[in-house]
């Protein structure tokens, strides 16, 4: 299977989605280091700027290479050049099934940026990558992520009870799915 590729840059009505680089590490660290962003997204807060740089230089590209994942995007509000969040595919379940994930700085919550960014990536993935299905997981307490999934037309497929989150707390793990055939009628 050839490497999944996406354009370096996408634009939506209010956002620019672009590949993240080490030059973005400081912007990314400002939100990835926040517990209210990191824990609901399933990872511990990034401790140092150096840790974020290492992630961008090594962990992210190695994961993408190993799982044949497209690079994904940083979320930039038009008129700025600052990355305030990310949207990407973080896991390949099968050749034609990817899992989408997203994060956003709390200063930008409640403005509809994540659904707008995810919609652009989902549309591109179904059209250009030939995916059959896109999956999304979130913890039961993450009401914002649940709303994003529902707004984008995902169907709740499973509730896995009493899983541990990134802090070791017991909570439900919700699994959503969106088929290409469902996306085509939206």
Identify the residue ranges that each predicted region occupies.
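Acyl-donor (CoA/ACP) binding surface of acyl/acetyltransferases
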Residues: 1-38, 72-186
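Short, surface-exposed helix-loop/turn micro-motifs enriched in polar/charged residues
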Residues: 43-44, 67, 96
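Hydrophobic residues in alpha-helical segments
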Residues: 32, 41, 63-65
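A short hydrophobic/aromatic micro-motif that marks alpha-helical segments and, especially, helix-coil
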Residues: 48-50, 63, 168, 183
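A short helix-loop-beta-strand connector motif used in the catalytic cores of GNAT acetyltransferases and
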Residues: 59-74
């Amino acid at each position: 299977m050839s490497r999944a590729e996406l354009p370096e840059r996408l634009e939506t009505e209010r956002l620019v989605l672009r590949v993240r680089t080490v030059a973005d590490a400081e912007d990314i660290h400002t939100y990835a280091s926040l517990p209210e962003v990191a824990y609901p997204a399933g990872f511990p807060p990034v401790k140092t700027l150096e840790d974020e740089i290492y992630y961008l230089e090594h962990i992210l590209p190695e994961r993408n290479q190993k799982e044949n994942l497209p690079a994904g995007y940083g979320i930039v509000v038009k008129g700025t050049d600052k990355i305030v969040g990310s949207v990407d595919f973080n896991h390949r379940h099968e050749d034609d099934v990817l899992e989408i994930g997203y994060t956003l700085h709390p200063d930008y919550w409640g403005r509809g940026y994540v659904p707008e960014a995810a919609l652009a990536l989902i549309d591109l993935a179904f059209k250009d990558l030939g995916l059959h299905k896109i999956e999304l997981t979130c913890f039961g307490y993450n009401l914002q992520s649940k709303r994003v999934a529902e707004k984008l037309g995902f169907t709740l497929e499973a509730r896995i009870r009493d899983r541990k989150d990134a802090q070791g707390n017991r909570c439900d793990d919700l699994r959503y799915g969106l088929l290409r055939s469902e996306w085509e009628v939206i």
